[in-house]
């Protein structure tokens, strides 16, 4: 895709060039077989020196030891992490103590009780009537 005045990248073949031109990397990917462990030493090591990674997607994207090594080597300046392989993040995990890692609480929104009850009840009634239900996850897509 071409956008005037914007450098665009597409597909895995363009990923190395994209990373080399990036100071910040924000992961918003679904967790699939193709994206598991995508935030690894090779991928993160291609970011510009002094880069920063932000993961608000899924903990399975990040290889913890690779991130720690790149932070400790000075290649990466920092990381902001909202999701982890094990949640809640164990108290003894090094992410809590690392000076270049910011851990944020994984809460995107507060659940509103009355609205949630109405939504669930509405979906049950739609299913009983044989109607399509919105928001159904398709496991064949991997997310």
Positions of PLM-derived features:
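Rossmann-like adenosine-cofactor binding region
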Residues: 1-94
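C-terminal helix-to-coil terminal segments
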Residues: 87-143
């Amino acid at each position: 895709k071409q956008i005037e005045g914007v450098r665009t990248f597409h597909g895995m073949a363009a990923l190395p060039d994209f990373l080399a031109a990036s100071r910040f990397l924000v992961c918003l990917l679904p967790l699939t077989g193709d994206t598991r462990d995508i935030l690894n030493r090779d991928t993160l090591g291609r970011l510009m020196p002094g880069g920063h990674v932000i993961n608000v997607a899924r903990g399975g994207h990040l290889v913890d030891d690779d991130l720690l090594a790149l932070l400790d080597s000075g290649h990466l300046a920092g990381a902001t992490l909202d999701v982890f392989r094990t949640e809640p993040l164990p108290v003894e995990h090094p992410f809590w103590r690392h000076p270049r890692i910011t851990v944020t609480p994984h809460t995107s929104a507060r659940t509103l009780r009355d609205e949630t009850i109405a939504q669930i009840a509405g979906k049950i009634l739609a299913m009983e009537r044989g109607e399509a239900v919105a928001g159904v996850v398709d496991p064949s897509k991997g997310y």
